[in-house]
């Protein structure tokens, strides 16, 4: 499995992985992403900002994740406490967003590999933590995060979304 920065040539394959992720969430009764998120313009912006990574194997797209060291304003007002003092204006963390895997090639450890890659990237940038959030109903993601050593630190409500469920659970993993 190779994990690399996405390019615009990957757009259609990435969109297909996200469509598959939307379908997975819908099957589980989770309303996250059902409004079409992540939108094509978001995917393009993630690629242009060099923050979108793809996991591939022999030209098959296994998964995708947005990894950013730029901070996240949504994380500035959680109901809870981050373990590190970083804010969106002065981030000391790597943000992980929009993780999706291809169900047609499931059970290859793709999500675990993407999170491991995120940890390596955070260390390269000398960051102190990784932060991620997820829908309260996404029990698979909650279980994965806990298995990978993330701690549930609080919750917040998305400010700029059309999704029905705005509540998100926040997780953090400290790097030593």
Each model region followed by its residue ranges:
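Conserved acetyl-CoA-binding loop-helix of GNAT-fold acetyltransferases
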Residues: 101, 107-120, 143, 147
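Conserved GNAT acetyl-CoA-binding A-motif
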Residues: 115, 122-134
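Conserved active-site alpha-helix within GNAT-family acetyltransferase domains
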Residues: 112, 124, 136-154
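Conserved GNAT-fold acetyl-CoA-binding loop/helix
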Residues: 15, 22-42
